[in-house]
UniProtKB/Swiss-Prot annotation:
It comes from Mammaliicoccus sciuri. The record marks N101, F102 as: Cleavage. Belongs to the BlaI transcriptional regulatory family. Changing R38K: In strain: K8. This is Methicillin resistance regulatory protein MecI. GO terms for biological process: negative regulation of DNA-templated transcription; response to antibiotic.
Length: 123
């Protein structure tokens, strides 16, 4: 997985979030969860599952004739690598540019400012 780019579509993130939440989920479980929030057809959702499987983000095991899907990547790892790819593309690898952009444009609460200070002081 380390050699692959961590490119996941917004729709694929929704599938991954369900799999991370449930640990193991059948296609029908995933379909039910997504259809509570989205008006997507079962075929569309199965296509997303297949894409994630082919990309190597998830795997499956058969349990009583039903495939149970599970993640092959840690949620925190993929979020970090996806964020890093984004920073490299948009900010040319300049993490400080990203942070400065958000700090300057966002209204931060005192708690958020204090949390940022604490994180920076630990570095």
């Amino acid at each position: 997985m380390d050699n692959k780019t961590y490119e996941i579509s917004s729709a694929e993130w929704e599938v991954m979030n369900i799999i991370w939440m449930k640990k193991y989920a059948s296609a029908n479980n995933i379909i039910e969860e997504i259809q509570m929030q989205r008006d997507w057809s079962p075929k569309t959702i199965r296509t997303l599952i297949t894409r994630l499987y082919k990309k190597g983000f998830i795997d499956r095991k058969k349990d009583n004739k039903i495939f149970q899907y599970y993640s092959l990547v840690e949620e925190s790892d993929i979020k970090y690598k996806t964020s890093k790819n984004f920073i490299n593309k948009v900010y040319k690898g300049g993490f400080n540019s990203l942070v400065l952009n958000f700090v300057e444009k966002e209204d931060l609460s005192q708690d958020e400012i204090e949390e940022l200070r604490n994180i920076l002081n630990k570095k």
